[in-house]
Amino acid sequence: PAIGVTCTNPSVTAGNTHYFRICFLDPFQGTVLANYATEKLGATIAYCLGELGNDYDTGLIYNFKQAFEKNGGMVVDEYFQTGNTDFTSYLTNASMYGAQVIFAPCSLAYAALICSAAGAQGVTTPILGSDTWDSNVVVDAAAGQNITIYVSTFYQEGGSPEFDAGFKAWINSDSVHLANNNGNDMISAVSAMGYDAYMVALEALKAAGSKDPKAVNAALWDVKYDGVTGAIAFDETGDAIRDVAFIKHLDTANSAWELAAVQGKD
């Protein structure tokens, strides 16, 4: 069996009896972000930007658009070619359309470029990123810039003090660990999720009483584990049962994430 950590596309576990995941799914994430945009940011016009042909971007934009329009809002969506490095025209378009929020669920490399371009253009429209944006890369790209960034994610530092302390001690114990974490000991959600996935695997091994793959696979369906990112159990397709996401705001002046809300889809 396999346990996915942050693979949010619904198709990952579809029709597969030995693939599990501990994260929420894109339909949930897209809805949560749309609700946050309308309920907390008061947005009625959204500009969505993604990479052309990228299933992750396309799927999340679709889910966001469905929920945002259901809330009474209007959505304009555009897609850039793979390898694009200049986002000036896209951000100009967002302003031209009167966007009150920008949703860009793209990869980290593009996220960093979008942050830099937004800062250079003086974009004040709030930018929403998906779970991929929860990274030190985004923190560094936006440092000192007068831009507003929110992301949806699986964990907020401070959620489990014991885990936080242990992770930071491990990071700071080795220069290679520190370098691999972008030179600091900030805890991104994927680190906490990776830890929980590992612990879920151990729980399945203990329940199975064996290292036999079939026995471990059978045991996984019934695993219930209180992780650092929340309670974990699996539904009939192997997906984790999750009902909330963490929305974080980036304090660009101090290069730190702050918890903005714990948001559900309803």
Regions found by a protein language model. Name each.
Residues 175-192, 200-256:
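Segments of small-molecule ligand-sensing domains
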Residues 18-82, 101:
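An alpha-beta-alpha
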Residues 1-20:
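Flexible loop/hinge segments that line or gate small-molecule binding clefts
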Residues 115-195, 250-264:
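Extracellular/periplasmic periplasmic-binding protein-like sensory domains
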Residues 8, 29-33, 56, 60-67, ...:
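Stable alpha-helical elements in mature extracytoplasmic
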Residues 1, 5, 36-40, 52, ...:
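Structured segments of extracytoplasmic/periplasmic soluble domains
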Residues 17-23, 50-53, 150-157, 183-189, ...:
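Second-shell loop/turn segments in exported
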Residues 2, 60-157:
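Extracellular/periplasmic bilobed ligand-binding domains
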